[in-house]
Amino acid sequence: MNGIPTPTVDIQWASDAPDAPDETHLCEWVRHAAIAAGGVVGDITLRIVDEEEIRTLNRDYRDKDAPTNVLSFPFEMPEGLPEGAMDPLVGDIIICAAVVRREANEQHKPLVAHWAHMVTHGVLHLLGYDHIDDDDAIVMETLEIRALGELGFPDPYSPAQQESQAQPENTELNP
């Protein structure tokens, strides 16, 4: 993909999510977000879970006892292992299908567009982007908007997007 390194993606289904995008789209969105961030070499696991699993993870790792849409866990090399002892692992992204579905309905967004946004958002967190302060949020949101726009999806932060039920111009991915 234009000489920019992209990750290997492993999809894990830990939830029955009949309206979730297929693995082809999920993998493409992960890779596209990585490209938007400048590229990355390594393995990314994308795990689709239910509310119980994401609530447990959110409670255990963020002290928030509630389900959330997406969590990212960058890989940290265990102490004592020599450099290069393991294949390059980028980390894990956990997405709750039920929360994504609920948010898309509440925000009046097409489900596929919200899935693409959550995947992109998770990848950027995995690669070190954040939105804790305003300056960082601007950087991260700009990358999200650009990456999603390149895939044919509307700006997820636009008030017009949140009021529109229109499908994105392109729900298929560009090669």
Curated annotation (Swiss-Prot):
Necessary cofactors: Zn(2+)
Cofactor note (record): Binds 1 zinc ion.
Pfam family, one: YbeY
Biased composition (Polar residues): 159-175
Subcellular location(s) per record: Cytoplasm
Family: Belongs to the endoribonuclease YbeY family.
SS bonds (residue pairs): none
Disordered as annotated region, ranges: 154-175
Function, as annotated: Single strand-specific metallo-endoribonuclease involved in late-stage 70S ribosome quality control and in maturation of the 3' terminus of the 16S rRNA.
GO BP term (any one): rRNA processing
Matching PROSITE patterns: UPF0054 (PS01306)
GO cellular component: cytoplasm
Major place of residence: cytoplasm
Organism of provenance: Alcanivorax borkumensis (strain ATCC 700651 / DSM 11573 / NCIMB 13689 / SK2)
Protein name stated in the entry: Endoribonuclease YbeY
Spans traversing the lipid bilayer: none
